[in-house]
Design a protein with these regions (language model features):
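ATP/Mg2+-dependent ligation/transfer catalytic cores
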Residues: 1-205, 247, 394-454
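Catalytic-core signal marking the mid-to-C-terminal active-site face
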Residues: 7, 20, 233, 240-241, ...
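Conserved structured core elements
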Residues: 7, 40, 124, 143, ...
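Broad gene-expression machinery/nucleic-acid interaction feature
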Residues: 24, 104-108, 144-148, 214-216, ...
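A generic structural motif
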Residues: 31-33, 112-118, 181, 221-227, ...
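Short glycine/proline-enriched loop/turn "hinge" motifs that connect secondary-structure elements
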Residues: 96-103, 141, 206-211, 258, ...
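Histidine-centered divalent-metal-coordination microenvironment in nucleic-acid enzymes
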Residues: 148-162, 208, 212-220, 252-273
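Acidic, His- and aromatic-enriched active-site or binding-groove loops in soluble protein domains
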Residues: 164-189, 224-235, 239, 273-279, ...
Length: 454
């Protein structure tokens, strides 16, 4: 069981502020896109006021598009409602230093309305609710995420000015597992690893990947909410460190026509004693609860794809032979399947291979828990494992577009029962906003094909 001692205590923060080592405190929450939104406070003001009373933020922060434009269709926040505030309450268990920003500490916030009720559609609250349901069964979810990213020698400003085209990757060829290839940018990778350690994350390893400039840094699994918070902190911190080093990196799911950036999510279940309950002497070494839990993943996978692949670009990863899944199938250590069972005994777990680097971890893990509970509560039977190439199989396919995924989500009785109508409608509208924006956009592809030749 993970140690719940925060990386930095309030008493330690008081001492660091008094000594002048900390002068800034960031309070932030994950938004719908998984980005950290919040404020930077003078440290003394934070200790005197915000620590005890929280702060406020405009509730449009959970009702805007990626460009921060106000958009229609959200029940909780609109022009008609006046775009008021919600409260941001610091979760003291998340207090930590952020070494990549001098003199700075950070906390993650929970959101509540002025009457004290939680903001139901907030990603952190959505995950909390599913973890509470899991706890009613005496279970805790242990989760690890594996984020890939591509590093470019261009700065973020240069990338913007170039419309993100023609950028120079940090490596020129496939460096999957290459020690020589990763050595090209080891100073950057080492700084990210070490400064994430300083922020309280437990780094396991780093390796190269297939797309030129593509890398992965892996962190030790932890309880679900801890992992998801750290995932968001890591993504923000890695980008900030890259910017400080004069380079850029992207976690977008599919930057080009080569391998996309994945975010495989591993999940296991433990009981009150910290014992992994997914393993026993049953078929494949899997316990009955794991078989039901995994069957629930299969049953809800298409309906919950919006949580695993939330953007238009997300679905361009799902190509045959790309190591991104296309089939709703499970297998033992089979990377062609959407769900891969790995480990044995106390390390028994499953991996969901759908999410890309653009995933909101709080929403995705909430989906995994809700799907698993559906399987457990309905006592679903697990079908036979896929033992061959799932890409060429007759299994049902994952959705191929955001539009398809959004329709499945909107009409899913499993989603409505697990998350409630408010959450289902909120994230259906998020997809609608993205689809409307994309449908109205004139793309480079259209210009190349039509400017002269049509």
């Amino acid at each position: 069981v993970a140690d719940r001692t925060p990386p930095l205590s309030v008493e330690e923060l008081h001492a660091l502020v008094a000594s002048g080592e900390i002068d800034t405190v960031v309070l932030a929450f994950p938004d719908m896109q998984g980005r950290l939104q919040g404020k930077r406070f003078a440290a003394r003001f934070f200790l005197d006021e915000v620590l005890h009373h929280g702060t406020e933020g405009c509730n449009y922060l959970l009702a805007v598009d990626t460009d921060m434009n106000t958009v229609d269709g959200y029940e909780m926040s609109s022009w008609d409602r006046g775009y008021g505030d919600f409260a941001m309450h610091p979760d003291l268990s998340t207090l930590r230093r952020v070494p990549w920003n001098a003199g700075t500490a950070m906390l993650v916030a929970d959101l509540a309305w002025n009457n004290g009720s939680p903001v139901v559609a907030a990603p952190r609250q959505i995950l909390r609710r599913q973890l509470e349901r899991l706890a009613e069964h005496g279970l805790t979810a242990q989760v690890g995420t594996e984020l890939e990213f591509i590093v470019f020698k261009d700065t973020y400003e240069q990338a913007w000015d170039a419309n993100y085209r023609g950028l120079t990757p940090a490596n020129q060829y496939n460096i999957d597992y290459s020690v020589l290839g990763t050595g090209r940018i080891e100073p950057l990778l080492r700084r990210i690893r070490n400064e994430m350690t300083g922020a309280g994350l437990t780094v396991e390893s780093a390796k190269g990947e297939c797309n030129p400039g593509q890398h992965e840094i892996v962190f030790k699994y932890d309880e679900a909410l801890v992992t998801c918070d750290q995932h968001a902190i890591y993504k923000t911190g890695a980008k900030e460190i890259a910017a400080q080093e004069g380079v850029s990196l992207t976690f977008m799911a599919k930057y080009n026509e080569r391998e996309g950036n994945s975010c495989h999510i591993h999940l296991s279940l433990t009981d009150a004693d910290g014992t992994n309950v997914m393993a026993d002497d049953g078929p494949g070494g899997m316990s009955p609860i794991m078989r039901h839990f995994l069957a629930g993943q299969l049953a809800a996978l298409r309906d919950f794809s919006l949580l695993y692949a939330p953007n238009i670009n997300s679905y361009k990863r799902f190509q045959p032979g790309s190591f991104a899944p296309t089939a709703v199938a499970w297998g033992h250590d089979n990377r062609t399947c959407a769900l891969r069972v790995v480990g044995h005994g106390r390390s028994m777990r499953f991996e969901n291979r759908l999410p890309g680097g653009d995933v909101n971890p709080h929403l995705a893990v909430a989906g995994l828990v809700a799907a698993g509970l559906y399987g457990v509560e309905q006592k679903l039977e697990l079908p036979e494992a896929c033992t061959g190439n799932a890409y060429t199989s007759e299994y049902e396919h994952v959705p191929t577009t955001l539009r398809e995924a959004a329709e499945l989500w909107e009409n899913s009785p499993i989603a409505k029962a697990a998350f409630g109508d408010e959450v289902v409608a909120h994230y259906r509208n998020m997809a609608r906003v993205e689809l409307d924006a994309f449908d109205a956009a004139v793309t480079d592809w259209e210009l190349r094909r039509s400017f002269e030749r049509m």
